[in-house]
C-alpha cells in the first residue's frame, strides 16, 4: 500500500500546481462552438419530432421523457410500473445507507418474453379530436342545487382536462417495434433507452427506426456536451480567461483522477466534439501539447494476466482497435477504428452482451487471449475467497460482497475484472508519468506548464521555443514509468 500512497502524495503536489496555473480558454471559440451545436440541436429536434409523429400519430411525446422513449422504441407500455419493476427486480434500493441499482432477475429468453407480454400492452397510433364534453377548454360546469349552471371550473373527466381526446387506431401499432432480447433492455419505467442501449439497437434497426435511434444518440450527446462542457466551462472560467478546474484523487473507486467545476474527465474525443480547441496557450505564439499512451488498458491487462498472445501482438505492433473493427465488420457490423475501442475494452472487463456481431467478437477475443480469460477466473476466485485484490503497485481493492451466486456467477464480476485494469493503468501508471514529466520540466527550468491529465494523456501549455524540450520531457517521463 505504501508505494501507491507515496505516488499519490507526489501526484497531489503536481495537481495543486495544475489547479493553481489553470488553463486559458478562448471564449470566442467557445461562443462559436455553442452556436454551432445549438443549431445542430435544433435541427435534430425537428427531425426527431417528425419521425416520432409518423410513428405515434397524434400521441403526445417528449424527447426527454424516459417513459415516452420506452413506448416509442419498443411499442409497448407496462400495465402497472410497480408490478413491472417487482417482476423483474428493477429500479434502486438502499444498501447500507447508499442507493444502488437492484440486480435484475436472471431468466431464459422464453420466460422473459412471456412476462413482458403479460405485464405490458401494445401501444397503438392515435388521432386527436377536440373533446366534445368541454369543447376543448378542459373544464366543465356543474349544475347548482337551484338548477342553474355554475362556471366551468371542474376538470373534464372525458379528456383529463387537456381539452383533447386521443382515439386509438387498433389496426396500426405505434412506435418502432424493437424487441428486448435480454433483461438488461428493461428498466423500472418500461424499457431502457440509455446511451448504450440506443447504440446497440441502432445496429439492428432499419428504416425510420434506425434513423430515429441514430439521431437520438447524437441528440443526447450534443445535449450532454452543451450542459456539461460548454456551460460548465463558461460558468467556471475567471475574468482573466483562466479556468481553474478542481482535481480529485479520492472519488473514483478505481483510483483514477476525476475533476469538477467543470468535469473535464468525461471530455469527448476531439473528432467527435472539438471542445479541446477552446483550450489555448496563455502565451502569444504558444501551443498546447498533448501526449498519450497507446492502447494502455489492453497492454495493462496483457501484463497483469501474463497473456503470451496479447504480449506478442503488442510486441508485433498489431493495432488491436483496428483488428476489433475488422472482426466486427466481417461479422456484419461495419465499425470504424474509433468506434471499435469500446468493444476492445469491454471483454477486458468480462463484457459479453451486445449485438450478434459483438457477441461473436467477444467469443473470438476469449479464444484468442486465453491468458486474460484465465486471469479473470483467477481474480474472481481470489475476490470470493479473500474479498480483496492487490495490484503490483500495492493498491488494494476490497470486495466484501464478492460471492458465488446462482448459476455459478460471481456477484459483481464486472467490477472485480475492471478495477485492477483501470486502476493500474490510470490510477498508478499515468500519475507516475505525470510526476516524472512535471519533475523533468522543473529540472530543465521550463516556463511551460502542465495543465491537465485526462485518462491516459498529459496536456501541457507550451511556451514559445520550448516545443522540443516539452516533447522530450513527455516522452522520457512517460516511458520512464517502466524503470
Which residues does each predicted region cover?
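Conserved "right-hand" nucleotidyltransferase catalytic core of DNA-directed polymerases
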Residues: 1-270, 283-287, 363, 371, ...
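Short alpha-helical scaffolding segments that buttress acidic/His motifs in well-ordered protein cores
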Residues: 11-15, 213-220, 297, 301, ...
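Conserved catalytic core of nucleic-acid polymerases
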Residues: 13, 20, 128-157, 164-165, ...
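Catalytic palm subdomain of template-directed nucleic-acid polymerases
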Residues: 17-41, 301, 352-356, 458-475
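Glycine- and acidic
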Residues: 19, 23-31, 215-216, 278-288, ...
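Short, contiguous acidic/charged loop-to-helix segments that flank catalytic cores in large enzymes
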Residues: 146-147, 201, 229-238, 270, ...
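Function-dense linear segments that define catalytic or interfacial modules
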Residues: 245-333
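A common structural junction motif
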Residues: 475-483
Amino acid at each position: 500500500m505504501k508505494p501507491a500512497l507515496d505516488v499519490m502524495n507526489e501526484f497531489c503536489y503536481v495537481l495543486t500546481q495544475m489547479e493553481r496555473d489553470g488553463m486559458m480558454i478562448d471564449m470566442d471559440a467557445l461562443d462559436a462552438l455553442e452556436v454551432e451545436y445549438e443549431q445542430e440541436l435544433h435541427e435534430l429536434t425537428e427531425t426527431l419530432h417528425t419521425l416520432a409523429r409518423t410513428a405515434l400519430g397524434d400521441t403526445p411525446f417528449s424527447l426527454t421523457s424516459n417513459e415516452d422513449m420506452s413506448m416509442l422504441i419498443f411499442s409497448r407500455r407496462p400495465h402497472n410500473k410497480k408490478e413491472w419493476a417487482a417482476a423483474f427486480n428493477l429500479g434502486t434500493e438502499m444498501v447500507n445507507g447508499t442507493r444502488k441499482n437492484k440486480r435484475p432477475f436472471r431468466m431464459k429468453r422464453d420466460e422473459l418474453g412471456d412476462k413482458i407480454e403479460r405485464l405490458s400492452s401494445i401501444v397503438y397510433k392515435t388521432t386527436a379530436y377536440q373533446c366534445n364534453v368541454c369543447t376543448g377548454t378542459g373544464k366543465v360546469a356543474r349544475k347548482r342545487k337551484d338548477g342553474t349552471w355554475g362556471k366551468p371550473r371542474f376538470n373534464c373527466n372525458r379528456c383529463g382536462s387537456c381539452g383533447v381526446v386521443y382515439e386509438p387506431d387498433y389496426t396500426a401499432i405505434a412506435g418502432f417495434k424493437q424487441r428486448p432480447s435480454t433483461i438488461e433492455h428493461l428498466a423500472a419505467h418500461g424499457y431502457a433507452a440509455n446511451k448504450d442501449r440506443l447504440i446497440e439497437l441502432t445496429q439492428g434497426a432499419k428504416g425510420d427506426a434506425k434513423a430515429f435511434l441514430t439521431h437520438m444518440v447524437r441528440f443526447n450527446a450534443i445535449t450532454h456536451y452543451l450542459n456539461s462542457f460548454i456551460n460548465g466551462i463558461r460558468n467556471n472560467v475567471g475574468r482573466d480567461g483562466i479556468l481553474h478546474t478542481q482535481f480529485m484523487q479520492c472519488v473514483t473507486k478505481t483510483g483514477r483522477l476525476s475533476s469538477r467545476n467543470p468535469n473535464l474527465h468525461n471530455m469527448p474525443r476531439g473528432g467527435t466534439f472539438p471542445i479541446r480547441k477552446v483550450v489555448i496557450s496563455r502565451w502569444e505564439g504558444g501551443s498546447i501539447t498533448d501526449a498519450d499512451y497507446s492502447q494502455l488498458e489492453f497492454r495493462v491487462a496483457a501484463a497483469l494476466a501474463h497473456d503470451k498472445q496479447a504480449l506478442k501482438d503488442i510486441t508485433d505492433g498489431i493495432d488491436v482497435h483496428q483488428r476489433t473493427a475488422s472482426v466486427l465488420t466481417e461479422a456484419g457490423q461495419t465499425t470504424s477504428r474509433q468506434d471499435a475501442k469500446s468493444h476492445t475494452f469491454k471483454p477486458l472487463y468480462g463484457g459479453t452482451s451486445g449485438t450478434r456481431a459483438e457477441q461473436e467478437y467477444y467469443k473470438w477475443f476469449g479464444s484468442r487471449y486465453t491468458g486474460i480469460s484465465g486471469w479473470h477466473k483467477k481474480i474472481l476466485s481470489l475476490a470470493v475467497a479473500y474479498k480483496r485484490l492487490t495490484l503490483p503497485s500495492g493498491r488494494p481493492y476490497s470486495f466484501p460482497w464478492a460471492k458465488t451466486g446462482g448459476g455459478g456467477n460471481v456477484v459483481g464480476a464486472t467490477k472485480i475484472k475492471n478495477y485492477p485494469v483501470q486502476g493500474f493503468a490510470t490510477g498508478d501508471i499515468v500519475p507516475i508519468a505525470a510526476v516524472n514529466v512535471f519533475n523533468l520540466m522543473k529540472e530543465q527550468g521550463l516556463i511551460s506548464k502542465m495543465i491537465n491529465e485526462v485518462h491516459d494523456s498529459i496536456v501541457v501549455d507550451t511556451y514559445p521555443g520550448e516545443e522540443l524540450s516539452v516533447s522530450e520531457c513527455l516522452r522520457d517521463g512517460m516511458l520512464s514509468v517502466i524503470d
